[in-house]
Amino acid sequence: MSEVKVSAKMVKELRDRTGLGMMECKKALEESNGDVETAIDNLRKSGQAKAAKKAGNIAADGAIIIAQGESKAFLLEVNCQTDFVAKDENFTAFAETVANIALENNVTDVAAIAELPYGNDQTVEEARVSLVQKIGENIQIRRVEVLEGANIAAYRHGLRIGVVVSYEGGSAETGKNLAMHIAAFNPVAIDDEDVAADLLAREKDIIEAKARESGKPDNIVEKMIEGGLRKYLEEVTLLRQSYVMDNEKKVGDVLKAEGVKVLGFKRLEVGEGIEKKQEDFAAEVAATQALANK
């Protein structure tokens, strides 16, 4: 069989269909003897291998996507390794598509979402692998949160923070401002009763330990603990926080005046709980120089 000459037109077609670099496309076409479809199959196979290698890299950047239906909203976090890729239109298009697929199918389990149809005869997982091949970074669908309610306000701060809040009464503007407040102040609960018992107990232990270090009498220590817990609850409960639109007022007072009741909220921030690798550039240079001197 004679070898087919790879033309610029063939390379362009493969680039358009895969998004890969010119030299990668040229090499793939040479290996497939000019057959574009075979080249694509081979690249997908190598892409899966490449994706497996990339999976070990820490994906601590990314985007929060909000997909809203009539009575529910989905928050989806999709991670990549750098903020440069987080802003890439291919990455954001993938993340937005996955969020809408999750909403349409009412699926909140990440593993189950991966198996859903994505389009172009691909599953979500296959589309993710293809994107890893194209972009060259580890990309992961990390988590999904869903909130149901008749009135849901949503707010996204850049790509990094997403909030949805369910409420009764008031206006759409009030709901939007409430979502903005939650994005900015990151409450852990609506009110005191909603704060998790283990979280409150842990905070009390910390406050008590610090209070007892003062060496003051027990009755004073008890007052210090009481004051410390009150301050903590003012910081972490939505209704006790100072309102983002008017810090002279508490959120609870503003909502009461407007006849608004908060039923629930969800807030996601990119990379929460992920330990990002810190690069020591000076150490890297020193190690490189040491190797060069051997």
UniProtKB/Swiss-Prot annotation:
Descriptive protein name: Elongation factor Ts
Function field: Associates with the EF-Tu.GDP complex and induces the exchange of GDP to GTP. It remains bound to the aminoacyl-tRNA.EF-Tu.GTP complex up to the GTP hydrolysis stage on the ribosome.
Family: Belongs to the EF-Ts family.
Signal peptide from the UniProt entry: none
GO CC annotations, alphabetized: cytoplasm
Species this chain originates from: Psychrobacter arcticus (strain DSM 17307 / VKM B-2377 / 273-4)
Region feature (Involved in Mg(2+) ion dislocation from EF-Tu): 82-85
Predominant location category: cytoplasm
Pfam families according to UniProt: EF_TS
Domain of life of the organism encoding this protein: Bacteria
UniProt keyword Protein biosynthesis present: yes
Keyword Protein biosynthesis included in the entry's annotation: yes
A molecular-function term among this protein's GO annotations: translation elongation factor activity
Compartments reported by the entry: Cytoplasm
SUPFAM superfamilies membership: Elongation factor Ts (EF-Ts), dimerisation domain (SSF54713), UBA-like (SSF46934)
Keywords: Cytoplasm, Elongation factor, Protein biosynthesis
